[in-house]
Amino acid sequence: MAWAMDNAILETILQRVRPLIGQGKVADYIPALASVEGSKLGIAICTVDGQHYQAGDAHERFSIQSISKVLSLVVAMRHYPEEEIWQRVGKDPSGSPFNSLVQLEMEQGIPRNPFINAGALVVCDMLQGRLSAPRQRMLEVVRALCGVSDITYDATVARSEFEHSARNAAIAWLMKSFGNFHHDVPTVLQNYFHYCALKMSCMELARTFVFLANQGEAFHLDEPVVTPMQARQINALMATSGMYQNAGEFAWRVGLPAKSGVGGGIVAIVPHEMAIAVWSPELDPAGNSLAGIAALEQLTQTLGRSVY
């Protein structure tokens, strides 16, 4: 590769952004996430040829939350023809908060994209129709992608989310009223919350997502994860819709396809080169990791990387 990387570079980047800790806010609308220590900070890289770099709390597991929406879309792509998926969910950025009901009502129950809550719930509804055990299947996929056999769900987080699920339930029932939700709402919500409650580290996330940097192929697996076209499509969706309503700001500052979660994680893709995962639990007003975005900005400037 035409760039030099070592752990010391990542350590330097973390030191530069560490002063931001204390300026964001840990997600508190999910009680099980509110207790996470806000000072955590980690970063990891996995290259398409299997090299690994890390710094900070890169090996500590956390709740990946909405990062899982990429994985559920990947599973759906492996079980449904393309036209069936995109009849039920769009490909456009929302520009609204990730749990908005207003836009969904105006657009007759068709979510703008699979990375807002409504879109991810439709994808989970589709998986319920094709998989006998959707939660177990997700674990199998993630463990294979990551090469780690003990990745599991945080039952406390999943239960906490289900106990505070009124808004997501409203989203699901609204889509059901428009005929775009076919299965039992509580069952699908449980699957959705378990996906969000996957516990993974930065290093595990970088390794899991490196297939998106390598035209759908993971260096340690014999079979492609998705086709090259599907990998490009997923990266495009991440670029336009992966950072909630701040996708444009993120494109301006960082310039990579990425997906964030309110657990403080972000996964970013440098096509043909690497997957990057960062974690810092304190969030900005849009629900993205404050120090995590700054770390990615520093890294892309250091490496001279952008898809634009």
Curated annotation (Swiss-Prot):
InterPro entries: Beta-lactam/transpept-like, Glutaminase. It catalyses: L-glutamine + H2O = L-glutamate + NH4(+). Pfam families: Glutaminase (PF04960). This is Glutaminase. Homotetramer. Belongs to the glutaminase family. It comes from Salmonella enteritidis PT4 (strain P125109). It is an enzyme of class 3 (hydrolase). GO terms for biological process: glutamate biosynthetic process; glutamine catabolic process. Keywords: Hydrolase. One of its GO terms (molecular function) is glutaminase activity.
